[in-house]
């Protein structure tokens, strides 16, 4: 009788088969290295035996392959030695090339020399961290607990505060306008504290350290000669690097369009810069820099790991890309930490847009410095406006890791960066068209309403020039330049910073071209100090159109926290706007005029082919000087470019 019960299928393991194949392959390679091959007609020994005991006969064809197999085996055994030899030869060749380049023309090889030094510093740091990292960490931790007691910390803070006050009192004796900028910082901080969510919970350690780091960075960049030269050099290198965009855009759009049309001249720079940033992220360089900046701010300010990483990332990426660095942790972050994330996004600009603003002619070193200085200031002011009252889960950086993207190779990373920028470029172009059209409509409507009550020339810019004039003055801008700066602040706040920087570039171009300062009752350009302070004040995404961008980006990552994001987004926007204003005030305290004095006698007593800012300044001295100190040649040169009563 047949058994109807189904038989259980027996599992068959292929592991012995695999091991057998591996053994046969290894045995076969060993025989090949000996130059032998089993003969086709070889028979097994009497009494049986395995195939491995067959009679092997030499074979000339396999003997010819013996050197190749031996070389392969040698490389496999000593691959690490060959790797070190290759690295040594390449390093020696590179060092020799660098030495020859520096000996021939050091200024020409300066960029390569600086890059080499930076790479060597990174390599030395990683080597020391690998060898002595744990020991140094224990030593520093021990010293911190034993020496830096509470009274010593307070004493150091008091000494630092008194030092700043003493320095300001001595430094502002020659330039009183710096005191106005200092008063502006105090006013802005008082206003932010008045609007704080939890006044008694403010972490003054985070506020003081954040503002202190911002001041030290500004002091290094603006006041010290090495810092100023370094950032000026870095800005020049970025400008040269971005000029290579013209090769690609000229091929696609044509040289005529690239030179004459704004969209084809500026927007391709964003594509190129986004591609480069994507490559740097793939290589891990950006993550390394972000981690080190975040570590410095976290150690000094006592903030959590996630919020500090997001703010540090905002130095290089936009308000929607920086939260991606901490995307897995957004759901568990406190409201104060989310407020920091939003404030950091509003207080800085994206690295891709940095290239576009530099192409406008905006001072590159000021843009770079403003982006770096805004990071600690954003943390400080955010903790002032929305202090931490909950228990954070991310006090330690353990378990918090940065992603390296999904690209599999360098080419894919570059291609992905260029593809991502298409959406950014389209968004910028669409916003420019929409906002400029809306601005023109608003101005036309305001002018129409103003004509009804005999107010001529009423416009959005005119209203902003009156409403925001006190803000511009508190930044440290001269009163005669305040209306123009207030207009730009209004455009940045109610439209976007792209339009504001474009307007600022036009004022700067007119100044450099030597245009007259006033054309009727309208100012044609502003002073260099006002340009620098405005550059700092406009450096941020804090405008009302960014509210939707911020909410859309964060909500798409964590939909369940939509109500939390909506609750604090407006407060974060205002805080981000104040970060840019405080940044401008710090620049106003530290800014000193630089440049070589122009010899007006030598400049004007020769034929001048075109006007410039230096020519205008010298001609203004000629028109104001009633004596014959400059001579008729100087007066003739000035009257060729400017109309003045003296010329008649």
Curated annotation (Swiss-Prot):
Glycans are attached at residues 605, 625, 643. Residues 1-83, 130-147, 197-201, 287-294, 361, 449-470, 553-571 are cytoplasmic. GO terms for molecular function: azole transmembrane transporter activity; pyrimidine- and adenosine-specific:sodium symporter activity; uridine transmembrane transporter activity. It catalyses: uridine(out) + Na(+)(out) = uridine(in) + Na(+)(in); thymidine(out) + Na(+)(out) = thymidine(in) + Na(+)(in); cytidine(out) + Na(+)(out) = cytidine(in) + Na(+)(in); adenosine(out) + Na(+)(out) = adenosine(in) + Na(+)(in). N-glycosylated. N-glycosylation is required for localization to the plasma membrane and the transporter activity. It comes from the Eukaryota. One of its GO terms (biological process) is cytidine transport. The keyword Membrane applies. One of its GO terms (cellular component) is apical plasma membrane. InterPro entries: C_nuclsd_transpt, C_nuclsd_transpt_met_bac, CNT_C_dom, CNT_N_dom, Gate_dom. Due to its high apparent affinity but slow transport, adenosine could act as a negative regulator of pyrimidine transport under some conditions. It is a multi-pass membrane protein. The chain crosses the membrane at residues 84-104, 109-129, 148-168, 176-196, 202-222, 266-286, 295-318, 340-360, 362-380, 428-448, 471-491, 532-552, 572-592. Its main location: membrane. Residues 105-108, 169-175, 223-265, 319-339, 381-427, 492-531, 593-648 are extracellular. It is found in: Cell membrane; Apical cell membrane. The keyword Membrane applies. It holds the Pfam family Gate. Keywords: Cell membrane, Glycoprotein, Membrane, Symport, Transmembrane, Transmembrane helix, Transport. Belongs to the concentrative nucleoside transporter (CNT) (TC 2.A.41) family. Sodium and pyrimidine nucleoside symporter of the plasma membrane that imports uridine, thymidine and cytidine into cells by coupling their transport to the transmembrane sodium electrochemical gradient. Also transports adenosine, an atypical substrate transported with high apparent affinity, but low maximum velocity. Therefore, exhibits the transport characteristics of the nucleoside transport system cit or N2 subtype (N2/cit). Involved in renal nucleoside (re)absorption. This is Sodium/nucleoside cotransporter 1. It comes from Mus musculus (Mouse). The gene is Slc28a1.
